Amino acid sequence: MNTSTNFESFRLQALIEGFDEALEREWPPLTLLDMHTHPFAAKAVVTRGEMWLTVGDLTRQLRPGDTFEIERDVPHAERYGAEGATYWVARRKD
């Protein structure tokens, strides 16, 4: 998955990989999401802006072209940069 593909290509690849859905998420500038979980696994690629993803003691800065994966029910926090961020995300509800 990379940003040189279009969203439809991302969505089709996600379905081939066994994900249930794919969508584009857009976050406003300086949004902060405290530690939380999701009832689904996620695989995403950042397409605009920047964000920081914290899992446990590790925080990663993510920019366009960077990818991340997180399993269901894993506690994590998200912080979005001064321009906000957009990413394409595939979700698997298992």
Which role does the model predict for each range below?
Residues 72-94:
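Ligand-binding loop in jelly-roll beta-barrel domains
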Residues 1-26, 34:
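A short, N-terminal "cap"/entry segment at the start of jelly-roll beta-barrel domains
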Residues 54-58, 81:
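Short strand-coil-strand connectors
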Residues 24, 59-61, 75-77:
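Well-ordered beta-strand positions in beta-sheet-rich domains
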Residues 57-72:
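Short acidic-glycine-tyrosine-enriched beta hairpin
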Residues 37-53:
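Short, conserved beta-strand element in jelly-roll/cupin
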Residues 34, 43, 58-61:
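Short, surface-exposed secondary-structure edge patches
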Residues 18-19, 29-40, 94:
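Short beta-strand/loop turn elements enriched in aromatics
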